[in-house]
């Protein structure tokens, strides 16, 4: 039997079939989005708007946290959040770490700050306090509206106010809810939020 002659047309078709069978190279993945960069906290850009009387009051509270042997008017970075909260602020731990410049865990108990370093942090936290809107509060109370009729049970609201989040005392709850319940013990929560926000 004579050897087969190469057939250029068949060879071309085979090569084309092999090329078609090979998977196309995967497209390059899109570049990862850059994390949104929050501007670094710069205490030198903070304008102090407290009155001299307020500053004296803050300084007094600050000294109560001073644990240095010679009362040097300094606190550790780790105490900063406690002092802010003692002064009526309610920052998250993430906010505290941000104004501190995101220190390492071991620096929290070793690095110290004086009152002049602390004051711009207090000013920044107090200015940026996230106060909820009317809609936020209504949405939060809607969770307890089991009937979907715009009311919540007064007893349930009392329980929530006294046991969750920043707990209120019984007296505070009673003052807040005075005259808000209807004859069935229910509270129209939209009217309740308006009442609270009006002060």
UniProtKB/Swiss-Prot annotation:
Listed GO cellular component terms? myosin II complex
Provide the EF-hand domain boundaries: 53-90, 132-167, 167-199
Q: Where is the composition biased (Pro residues)?
A: 24-34
Processing and modification events after translation: N-terminus is methylated by METTL11A/NTM1.
Q: Where is this region: Disordered?
A: 1-44
Q: Name one GO molecular function term.
A: calcium ion binding
- Modified-residue entries (Phosphoserine), positions: 183
InterPro entries given for it?
CALM/Myosin/TropC-like, EF-hand-dom_pair, EF_hand_dom
Q: Which residues carry this modification: Phosphothreonine?
A: 92, 131, 133
Modified-residue entries (Phosphotyrosine), positions: 134
Q: Where is the composition biased (Basic and acidic residues)?
A: 1-15, 35-44
* Signal peptide (UniProt feature, chain positions): none
| N,N,N-trimethylalanine modified-residue sites | 2
Q: Which keywords has UniProt assigned to this entry?
A: Methylation, Motor protein, Muscle protein, Myosin, Phosphoprotein, Repeat
UniProt-listed PROSITE patterns: EF_HAND_2 (PS50222)
Q: Write out the function statement from the record.
A: Regulatory light chain of myosin. Does not bind calcium.
On assembly, the entry states: Myosin is a hexamer of 2 heavy chains and 4 light chains.
In Swiss-Prot or TrEMBL terms, this protein is called Myosin light chain 3
The organism is: Bos taurus
